Amino acid sequence: MPPALVDIPVDGPAAEVYRTSPEEGWRVIRTKWRVTGVVPGLIEGGGRASGYFTSATGITIYRGDAWPEENLGDAFIADCGSNLVHRKKIRRSGVELIAERPADEQKVEFLTSTDLWFRPVQFANAPDGCLYLCDMYREVIEHPWSLPENIKKLLDLNSGNDRGRIYRIAPAGFKQPGRPQLAHATTAQLVATLESKNGWHRETAARLLWERQDQAAAPSLKKLLKESKSPLARLHALHALEGQGMLREAELLTALSDTDAAVREQAVRLAEKFITNGAFPPALWTKLRELAGDPDIAVRYQLAFTLGEVRGGERLTSLAAIARQDAGSAWMRAALLSSLAEGAGELFTVLSGDPVFRATEAGQEFLRQLAALVGAKNSATEVNVVLAYLGQLNEPALAFSMTSALGEGLQRARVSLAQSGGAVAGILERAVKAADDGALPEAARVPAVRLLAHQPYAEAGKRLIALLDQSQPQAVQLAALGTLAKFNDASVGADLLPQWNSLTPRLRAEAVPVLLARPERATELLRAIGAGTIRASVLDSTQVKLLTSYRDATVRELAAKVLAASPASARQPIIDGYAPALSLKGDVAHGKKIYEERCISCHRSSGEGFALGPDFVTVKTTGKEKLLTNLVDPNHEVRPEFVAYVVETKDDESYVGLVVNETSASVTVRQAYGKENVIPRANIAKMRSQGQSVMPEGLEQNLTPQDMADLLEFISTAQP
C-alpha cells in the first residue's frame, strides 16, 4: 500500500526560504556551536543559521473573493522563525497533489518583514474575502529547550507576551464590503448564499442550513443543483440535501452527470448511501458503471472505493475497466484492492486473460498484487483458478513472480504454497530448472530463485547456497540470499557462514542482517566471530548493540563474551588522527570512488545511491570539520529520524534499521541498499530504539588522511 503520509512540496519539507530580516546573533552563535559540537542539537540546512523552513505553521488554503481569482486554492504557510509567509500553488498529478512555488516567487516570498519580532503563526479566510494573519509578535519564538543555557540567560523569553497583532492582507484598492447578517437570513437567502464566491459565506450558509434542518429548503436546493453555473454551489447543494435527509435518486443522477469532475466525485461517494443489500437501484447502478470510463481520474478513484460496497460479479467489469486505464497508479491499485473483499480471483482471471494488460509493467504489478490477495483470502476455488492459469502461462518470469506473490499471500493465511496441490508441483519444477539455467536472462532467473522459498528447505537450501557463488550474476546472488532469509530452518546460518570468504562486499553487507534476524543464526555468527573465522568488524555499532541486547538470553550472553574482546575505542583520537585531512586538497573523482565503495549503500549523492541516511546535498555546507566528526563518530550527534530501531516479531525474527513509515496496520523498517521490510503490527512482539545512529562506526578504516580529504571534497561538492 502507498504510504499514509505524503510530502507534496516539490522542494521538500526543509525548502529554501528567502527572509528579509537579519539573522539573530544568538541564532548564528547557536548554529556554530551545534556544528562544532559545543552544544547538542539538530544541525539543519547544512549548518546554516537560516534560509530554510524551521517552523512551518498555519497552513491555510485561500478561499476568499477579494483577491484575484488566480489566488484561489493557493496554500499559505507561515515560518515564524524567519519572519515570513510562504505561498504554494497546488495542482493535481493523477490522484496525488503537488505543491510548488509560484512562477513569480521563485527567489522571494509572498510576504516578509524586516522586523525580527514579526511572528506569523495562523491565518483565516475572513467574511470580507481577505486573508487574515495572526502575528504572535515575540522577541524570541523558539522553545526554551532548543536554546543553550549560555544563550538563554541573555534573552528575555517572555518579551512580547503582552503583544500580538492581526493583519488583514488586502489587495490594492480594496473596499470594505457590507457586514454579512447570515444569522438572521431566511432559508432562501442561505441557499442563495451557496453561490457566493466567498468561501466563508458559502461554508457559513451551509452550516446554518444544516443546523436549521428546514425541509422547505429542498426545492431551492434542488434547483441550485440543476441550474447553478457555480460548481462549488452545486457541490454545496448536493451535500446540503444529503445533510438534511432530502437527497433522492433523481438529484444524485443529476450530480453524477455534472460537467464538473469534483461534483461527480462527491456524487459517487454519496451514492453509497443508496446501497441496499449490496446493490444499487438499477438506474443508479447503470450510471455508476458508465463512470468507470470517466475522463477524470479522481472520479474513477472514488468509484474504485465505492465499488467495494457492492456485491455481485457485475462490479468486476467496472473494476477491470479502471484497472486497464489506471494500474500505473499505486494509489489506484490500492483503491481497487480495497474493494475486493470478494472476487479477487475472478478479476485476476479477467485481467490475466488480457494480453495487452499483461504485457505492461503496471499490469504485471497489479496481477502480482491480485495473486497475493487471492492467497491471503485462501479460497481454495480462487487459488486453484490462479494456479491453473499460471501452470499453463508461457511467460516463465511472469509465472514465477505471480506464483511467488500467491505464495506470500498464502503465508499470511498460514498456508503453504507447496500444500496447495494442483499445478504447484509443475511450476516449482520449472522454477528449479530456470534458477539453475545460466543461459537464461536475469529477468527470468531472479523470480525463479525467489519462488524456491516455497519449497521445503531440505530441497531448496543447497541450491540457494550454490547460487551465492561468484560466478552467478549479482542479481541472482542477491535473490538467493533474500530467499534464504525467508526460511526459519535452523540450518540456514550454519549453511551460509562457510560461504563467507567467497561473498562480495555487497553480499556480506546484506548477509549480516539475515544472520541477525533469528537467534539460531545469530548464535552461529557469534561462534564464527569467537573462533576467528569471521572478524567482529563485520558488525557495525547498531548491530553490536542489537546482539548485546538481543531478546534471546543465549545470544545476549554469547555476544557479551565474544564482543567484549574487541570493545569500541573512543572516537576522538581517531578524529584527531584525520585532522591533517582538513588542510589537504581533495580530489573529487577519487572521493567519488570512496563514496561508491563505502557510502552508496546508505547515502544519495548526485542522483545515485540509496536513501537510508541524509542525502549528501543536504549536509555539504555543514563544513568539513563537522563532516569529519560525523563520519568518524556518527553517534556524536544523531537526528531523531536517523536513530536505529529494533523490531522483533512473533515469528522470532529481528530487524534493525530506520522506521520510515508507520500506519495503523504496519511498520516499515528501511535498511541498507534501500531494502524495506513491511511488518504487520499484529506480528510485532517488541519495537525499541537503539538510541544511536543507524550509521555504523568504523567506516573510516584503512583510509589515509588524503583519502579522507578526497571524500570530504566529494561530499562538499555534492549535487542534487
Residue ranges and their predicted role:
Residues 196, 203, 207, 631, ...:
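Gly/Ser/Thr/Pro-enriched helix-cap/hinge segments flanking short amphipathic alpha-helices
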Residues 1-189, 200-201, 210, 280, ...:
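Beta-propeller domains with acidic blade repeats across secreted/periplasmic ectodomains
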Residues 237, 551-569, 577, 624, ...:
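C-terminal capping alpha-helices of c-type cytochrome domains
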Residues 170, 603, 715-719:
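Protein kinase-like catalytic domain
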